Amino acid sequence: VGVAAGLSAVGKIPFAHSFGPFITRRACDQIFMSGAYAKLNVKLIGSDPGITAQINGGTHMPFEDMGIMRGIPEMTIVEPTDIAMLKSVMKQMKETYGMYYMRLVRKSCIKVFEDGSEFQIGKAVPLRDGTDVTIIASGYCTAEAIKAADILEKEGIQAKVINMFTWKPIDEEAIIE
């Protein structure tokens, strides 16, 4: 993180990656002091969220990464759902000055969107209409949200599914709606 901040300070656009707990929890003070406080242009990527890193053990499973990053001022937080969204969001991250944290799975994920789809950071994506309940998900949990909506539909419950791929700034309008 310190090297990424240094690269940003001389005009580069660094993308730094590690397992979620290492790029967030272990580097939190560096992220705050060297990146956010200095108002630099650093892009952080944390992989293997939650139990997706189970083979590596508890030290590699970030459950608090999003909470840690939400507490960093001026930090934009995204969690793309599939490769089409990843491409769109990565392009925006590169083109937009500021601190970013992206949470990613390392393994394959479902395909939700068509190749070439564009997304706006900060704007949720409705995936399914429903009037009884709303399920909000991001990243790899989106597949589970869609499955849950299918199960609920068999029970006569119409579930709206929203892909909230931007955690910060969160799309308050989509939540209220």
Give residue spans per PLM region.
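Extended, non-catalytic structural segments that build the interaction scaffolds
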Residues: 134-140
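Alpha-helix N-cap/loop-to-helix initiation residues
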Residues: 24, 86, 141-142, 168
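Glycine-rich, anion-gripping cofactor-binding loops and their flanking helix/strand elements
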Residues: 169-177
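Short, glycine-/Ser/Thr-/acidic-enriched flexible segments
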Residues: 49, 107, 140-142, 166
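Short beta->alpha junction loops
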Residues: 162-169
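Short helix-loop-beta junction
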Residues: 144-162
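Conserved thiamine diphosphate
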Residues: 6-134, 159
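Conserved strand-to-helix beginnings and helix N-cap segments that scaffold or border functional pockets
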Residues: 28-29, 145-146, 172-173
